[in-house]
Amino acid sequence: MARDLLKGAVEGRFFRGNLHCHSSRSDGLLGPEEVVVAYRDAGYDFLCLSDHFEEEYGWRVTDTRALRDENFTTILGAELSSAPWEERNAYWVTAAGLPPDFGAPPADDHAEAIRRAADLGAFVVMLHPGLNNLPLAAADGLPALDAVHAVEVYNHNCAMAALPDRSNGAYMLDGLLEKGHKVLVNAGDDAHFGHPRDRFGGWVEVYCDQLDPDALLDSLKAGRYYWTQGPELQELLVDGDRLRVQTSDAYAISLTTGGDRWLCGSERHGEGVAPTTEAEFDLAPFRGSYCRVAVVDPTGRRAWSNPIWP
């Protein structure tokens, strides 16, 4: 019997959200309410305002609960670090789903906050490894790595600012997957509202039965979502070794993995060629490993599924 990897057994709909952005409570330029209004007015359904959780900002979680309404919700969270920023191989995470009174870590163990966040039920995303020049060779020794649920493979602020070559974290995602870590994929704006194009460029579409912070977190941790710059992943149906993909208009739909294995189920090249909206793949070549669906639309915007373990 076919199973839908995007929706599971849940009856619901997709909700658009961003898990990585900042306000004037840390190093962003707009106040929390202004940030929430900007995302709500741009058609988003939810937001995690992930201000930096550091001593210089008072070790506080920005409380956005008063900004929720019946059509837009917020997830409390913060950007945590594994070590002081100047330390070699420090890394940063969004912890989405923190209590408002989340306390500071011990001075000699910043990573304790990451472990504690996961223990409290937060969805933990490793952020911008490319921006931080975090080497894959250091991954096995990273503190609290077992608390990380997902890796940010696209950081829109980096892509739109002066660091486009640092916006890609796919090397870390694939490296961790090849080492046996079952991590998910993620993307975020990292918006600081410091220039006109640092927002609304990479988000998650989360399949859920209700617009509720706890329900959204459950879906995120279960992998019932995909990241996108615009293309829609509408269906990922697995039946035995066959994977059927339904999308919005696409220039290409492919199935890929780390290393040198990839399959391209549907491609459309050249002027005037009609886009595709579906593809079918054989999962057998990926048995014992993993793969993911990648979509490129006619304007070059991308979407990725979470890893699939056949």
Report each predicted region and the residues it spans:
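C-terminal functional module detector
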Residues: M1-F14, P32, K179-L184, A191-P310
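A metal-dependent hydrolase metal-coordination microenvironment
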Residues: A2-P129, N133-D146, E152-L173, G188-H195, ...
